[in-house]
């Protein structure tokens, strides 16, 4: 086996071996936001996150009924069963204000994500 071929194999092996480490580093750099939902209200009603950073929303539905967490601008939609928790992953965003709502109670159940 030639030296060039051995170096190529070693480089590929090293790159593949480092993939899990890169994934963990990316997961750790996400901003985590805690939200709760009860009586058609989100708490808190407004949250902030840094720009250009992935966001992980940890949502706890304290109501007995299901709700649908949705944002049309961010193309995020998730049904959350009553009395349960959900994790919603949001891609990194540019600065701005993004609205989320419960589709079943859209007019009153709203939360704002402010990205700075």
Q: Where in the sequence are the language-model features?
A:
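Beta-strand-rich interaction surfaces with strong enrichment in secreted/lumenal proteins
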Residues: 45-47, 75-79, 89
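Extracellular/periplasmic metallocenter environments
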Residues: 29-34, 80-116
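N-terminal edge beta-strand
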Residues: 29-52
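C-terminal segment of classical bacterial N-terminal signal peptides
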Residues: 16-25
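Bacterial N-terminal signal peptides that target proteins for export
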Residues: 2-13
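Short beta-strand/loop motifs in extracellular/secreted proteins, especially
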Residues: 55, 65-67, 109-111
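Asparagine-centered strand-capping/turn motif at beta-strand->loop junctions
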Residues: 59-61
